[in-house]
Amino acid sequence: MIYPEFPKKGDTIGICAPSFGVGHKLEWFDLAIETLNDAGFDIVETESVRNEAFPSAPADIRGAEFNSLFADNNINMVMSASGGDYNIEMIPFIDQKLVKSHPKWFAGYSDPTSIEMLLTTVLDIATIYGVNAGSFDWRPLHKF
């Protein structure tokens, strides 16, 4: 099992929308980004994150955006913006060779479970079944 280096203050988290975008709740999502920034992380969002559409973009676009975060050596961790119902559609567009050669933590819960299953069981990369990026909108953060 590959355990990527855990992100630390000053690292960059890439956020993608493999299912739903967050356009319907931008105020809350902006608060979540602010919380992550306040915790010391830089944030990079893919183009579809702030879309209102369900899904956030066609499956091939969502897959390409996911791949771009793993290809970027400046990104230390990848998180799903939110849950939804459409992650399974983008699985065929995940470049497994690319992801395996650039292992990073991927975090999300609910619909992102399908991505975590692929990364953990097929690519042998540990993942985090935990909050999506949009879940950091609590002030103060809940103690887990």
Can you say where each PLM-predicted feature lies in the sequence?
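ATP/NTP phosphate-donor binding region
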Residues: 1-74
